[in-house]
Design a protein with these regions (language model features):
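Short phosphate/oxyanion-binding micro-motifs
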Residues: 1-132, 145-150, 154-165, 176, ...
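Short, conserved micro-motifs composed of acidic
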Residues: 42-45, 151, 172-196, 417, ...
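Conserved pre-catalytic core of RNA-dependent polymerases
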Residues: 85, 386, 417-628, 667, ...
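Arg/Lys-enriched, amphipathic patches
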Residues: 101-106, 112, 134-148, 211, ...
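Active-site palm subdomain of RNA-directed nucleic acid polymerases
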Residues: 124-138, 515-533, 558, 563, ...
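Catalytic palm subdomain of template-directed nucleic-acid polymerases
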Residues: 143-154, 572-590, 664-690, 802
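Surface-exposed loop/turn segments and immediately adjacent short secondary-structure elements
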Residues: 211, 215-217, 240, 251, ...
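Basic, alpha-helical interaction scaffolds
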Residues: 232-269, 729-799
């Protein structure tokens, strides 16, 4: 079927009904008007047994093309193209024979002239025709082909004739009486028959039904093996675990590998008597909300449609339209009742709510894989690709590693030679400190492990202590990797668009957490932590790092100084770490010796990995580099590995900051007389960084490395750095805005690009949730909006202090739109009353709330050192802070200035609170009731 939907969002029910009742195999849609890759439309299609591949416009509304096809058909490739005059999507569907049909769905923009389109279309067809056979070109061409004497139509027909193509539609397809929707093919290659044009639908374009003589290749039903845990007698199971643990403990293990084998056997033997595996066929089924009443109404609707097609009687048409509307309303009623009952039956749990939301918005984590005939072959391809990718990067380095214990004589601090053994109570705290997420390779699923933790604790304690005392992790070093598509709109056929994700065994995570606690304690005692490295550290986050960076930028701008920032981009940084270099740092710089060093050496060495697809594992391959995927201690080790880079940049006069593999370096300068020196310094510094990274087997990507200069508005015309050229000929462009840890920073610190992007994304979420709000109660809708939209809206909003009134107004309007979404109000209705009912703070108050919360954390040792040192207590008795003097509004926006000002304006009873939760509660209540009076107090504390 071909159809110009003119917004599929509000016509999807009718399209789905047409697909199901007409037993259609595929639909080709133009003007979908989709705004995002995933929404409730794509979710509804998938729920009804169809897949969709579509192209949407990012920069403006309207347009969009899509191919919809049954789940069990194999769409071999799908690519979208956008030209100046039209957009299209290409899809290739194979038959059971070698025949392959290549569909191209086209939508021409009517804003541009037909002559421009014909020129582009000829070039497109010429390039496509050479490489593809069995072409079917269809879509809305916005050409009146029924007016055969017009010059544009004559030229269009000549183009088709040149390539042996025929246009098959000879009836009007638009309410205006013109033929706009076309079906084009080579009759000698592809036979199209039984073309029917149906004008009863909800668009100004007709349905075009047709048949193609081709037996499509269908996927076989998937057979999966599942285990059922529902009927376990937990008391009996726990008693069985206790008896097996007693046998385990009586063996007095001295070898970690033997103990691990016995533990796995213990768990497997305990489970096998209670859990049974069975194989089931995964077949298509109708949505769960479809009951017999709805099925009868839909069947009646179909009968009325067939009667009207047969008679073309006006009374039959009216009866069909009435039945169609009744079916539509009943489907909404049934879905609403089903989803609301599901949430209520789950005792209003947020987990059930978000599961339904993900399902309705097509946000569920479904596996997308390249087309394949054998999962094992594909798994081996992925494993080879992931290994060889790192091997190729490593081969680009021509460096001889230094001896393993190089630097031994230079370390004079305390050493750590052995781990302290843990008690069962201590281990239980470590286990419960994080959510229990098990791997499919674990001998016990997560919920059983949690329920039986007390019974398993003696065996777990023995295993953990054996690992710590012997320095062994043997048996826990095989990684099982799942390939995950990096971006939803990436080409799923290319292996480079996938990232390896490993879900580590839970026992390994537990041992690593125990090691991490003691290793961090040692580094705290020896003051070995890098203060400005914020990744994977308590009280540190992207927002704390950005607060520090923007504080320094604002302070420099306040003193009429510019700041140049270099944001590095590394290729596969975690995966190219050299084990010998890392072990050398652990030994010579941090003082890890004896059994502790042996544990790290054993943990890193002898690792293997395999890829799993649909339960089929590839062959294991040796993994000689990198910190282990999915490990708890891997990020900690990476921070250690790059610690010298931070020191190197500080020695060069830069302020260095890092978050995992994202590193940035800032340098302040006077534009009047230091600009030339800085322009020469940055390339040499990047060369120095490149040499250091080459030395440590890290690959710097100059083309993606970002450089930006933050400058006062008055100095904008004085800056003309242009491109920076490195010694190897690489060029680094100086940008006006950069993407830094999730926030777009612009050169004059207006945050306008970031706010625009955030609001655009937010309105997309509002649009999606609007499509499903009819299925969810208001209370549940509040939870969704707060968790999905407002949480993202508040992300890094502490940086918004001092933004322009225009930007503040945009944020306020967006917040109002969120409130209207919950209460179903239109855009012209006031929202003051519902904002109070929702207990939402105004946008400015939300920013102040976040900043004051960080000040509280700084004063109570709950923040990074680099933030805490910006806050100075002035008077201890009333807990007031020193407010530094500033010269411009830039200085007023710095955290070191605005933080104390906001703090000093609070009532003393709030400032003296010691509990963070209590402080936030009192602060929100105060802001909610007295924010206007609070703002009036701010002017009293401009400077100290």
């Amino acid at each position: 079927m071909l159809w110009n939907a003119r917004s599929l969002n509000n016509k999807l029910h009718h399209l789905t009904t047409e697909l199901l009742d007409g037993e259609l195999d595929a639909a080709f849609i133009t003007e979908t008007w989709f705004k995002t890759q995933l929404n409730n439309c794509t979710a509804t299609l998938k729920e009804n047994g169809f897949s969709i591949s579509h192209f949407h416009r990012d920069n403006k509304g309207g347009g969009g093309v899509a191919v919809i096809y049954r789940h069990n058909f194999k769409l071999h490739s799908s690519k979208s193209y956008s030209f100046d005059t039209f957009e299209c999507i290409f899809a290739s569907i194979s038959g059971n024979t070698s025949q392959k049909i290549n569909f191209i769905v086209v939508y021409r923009f009517c804003e541009l002239s037909p002559a421009a389109f014909l020129l582009e279309f000829r070039q497109f067809i010429e390039s496509t025709f050479i490489h593809k056979k069995n072409l079917v070109i269809l879509g809305d061409f916005n050409l009146h082909v029924n007016k055969v004497s017009e010059p544009d139509i004559i030229q269009f027909n000549e183009i088709l004739s040149t390539f042996g193509l025929s246009q098959l539609i000879d009836q009007p397809t638009h309410v205006s009486g013109n033929t706009l929707d076309l079906l084009i093919t080579n009759k000698n290659e592809t036979e199209i028959k039984d073309i029917v044009i149906d004008d009863i639908n909800f668009s100004d374009h007709s349905y075009i039904f047709f048949k193609i003589s081709c037996e499509l290749q269908k996927s076989k039903d998937k057979v999966i093996s599942i285990k059922t845990y529902k009927n376990i007698d937990m008391d009996k199971f726990k008693n069985d675990i206790v008896s097996k643990v007693n046998i385990f403990s009586g063996k007095n293990h001295v070898n970690f590998g033997d103990a691990l084998n016995d533990y796995n056997a213990l768990c497997e033997n305990a489970v096998k008597d209670y859990v049974f595996a069975k194989s089931i066929n995964v077949t298509e089924s109708r949505p769960k909300w479809m009951d017999s009443e709805y099925t009868q109404v839909r069947t009646h609707r179909r009968k009325l449609y067939k009667r009207w097609v047969r008679t073309r009687n006006e009374e039959d048409r009216i009866a069909f339209v009435s039945a169609r509307e009744k079916t539509h309303l009943l489907s909404i009623e049934k879905q609403s009742k089903f989803y609301r009952d599901t949430i209520c039956n789950a005792k209003n749990s947020q987990k059930a709510l978000f599961s339904i939301c993900n399902h309705l918005l097509d946000m569920s984590k479904s596996k997308v894989l390249p087309s394949h005939t054998s999962p094992i072959v594909l798994a081996n391809k992925f494993n080879d690709y992931f290994i060889e990718k790192i091997e190729k990067i490593r081969q680009g380095f021509r460096v001889l590693t230094r001896p393993l214990m190089d630097g031994l004589d230079t370390y004079l601090g305390p050493v750590m030679t052995e781990f302290a053994l843990v008690s069962p109570e201590c281990l239980k705290k470590i286990v419960l400190s994080k959510p229990i997420k098990s791997s499919p390779e674990d001998p016990l699923p997560g919920f059983l492990f949690k329920n039986c933790l007390d019974q398993l604790l003696p065996a777990l304690t023995e295993l953990v202590n054996l690992s710590l005392s012997t320095g062994s992790m043997e048996g826990l070093k095989d990684s099982i990797i799942t390939p995950i598509l990096k971006k939803v709109d990436s080409d799923s056929e290319l292996l480079k668009n996938y990232r390896p994700v490993c879900n580590t065994l839970y026992l390994s995570k537990t041992i690593e957490r125990t090691v991490l606690v003691q290793a961090n304690d040692h580094m705290d005692r020896t003051k070995a932590h890098t203060p400005n490295q914020s990744g994977y550290k308590p009280f540190h986050s992207c927002e704390t790092l950005l607060l520090k960076v923007t504080n320094d930028i604002f302070t420099n701008l306040d003193n009429s100084k510019c700041t140049i920032a270099v944001l590095l981009d590394l290729s596969a940084a975690f995966d190219t770490v050299d084990h010998d270099e890392l072990l050398s740092i652990l030994w010579s710089q941090l003082g890890f010796r004896g059994t502790v060093f042996q544990w790290f050496e054993n943990f890193l060495g002898g690792r293997k990995q395999a890829v799993i697809i649909d339960g089929h594992k590839s062959e294991f391959r040796n993994n000689r580099y990198g910190v282990p995927q999915g490990s708890v201690i891997g990020p900690f080790l990476f921070n250690i590995y790059v610690r010298d880079l931070m020191r190197l940049m500080e020695e060069e006069g830069f302020d260095a900051h890092g978050y995992a593999d994202d590193h940035q370096f800032l340098l302040k300068f006077q534009i009047d007389f230091q600009a030339t020196a800085v322009r020469l310094t940055i390339p040499s510094t990047l060369d120095l960084i490149g040499k250091w990274m080459n030395r440590y087997f890290l690959k710097l990507n100059p083309s993606k490395t970002q450089v930006i200069i933050f400058h006062p508005d008055s100095k904008h015309s004085d800056i003309s750095f242009g491109q920076l050229i490195l010694s190897n000929g690489s060029r680094v462009q100086i940008s006006n805005q950069v993407y830094n840890l999730g926030v777009t920073l612009d050169s004059n610190m207006s945050f306008s690009p970031h706010i625009s992007a955030s609001i655009s994304q937010g309105y997309g979420l509002i649009r999606n949730i609007t499509g499903i709000r009819k299925y969810i109660s208001r209370e549940h809708l509040k939870t969704l909006v707060n968790s999905i939209i407002i949480a993202k809206f508040d992300n890094c909003n502490s940086l918004y202090v001092g933004i322009s009134a225009y930007e503040a107004g945009r944020l306020r309007k967006f917040q109002n739109a969120c409130a209207r979404l919950i209460y179903g109000r239109n855009k012209r209705e006031h929202v003051s009353d519902i904002l109070r009912e929702l207990h939402w703070l105004p946008c400015e108050a939300r920013t102040y709330f976040k900043i004051v919360s960080y000040v509280f954390k700084c004063l109570h040792n709950l923040a990074p050192i680099y933030l805490s040192e910006l806050i100075v207590i002035k008077q201890l008795q009333d807990f007031t802070l020193y407010v530094p003097r500033t010269l411009t509004s830039y200085g007023d926006r710095a955290f070191s200035c605005i933080g104390p000002r906001l703090w000093n304006s609070l009532p003393i009873d709030i400032r003296l609170i010691n509990s963070l939760d209590c402080f936030k509660s009192k602060l929100k209540h105060y802001f909610f009731n007295s924010f206007t009076e609070y703002k009036a107090e701010l002017n009293k504390y401009k400077t100290s």
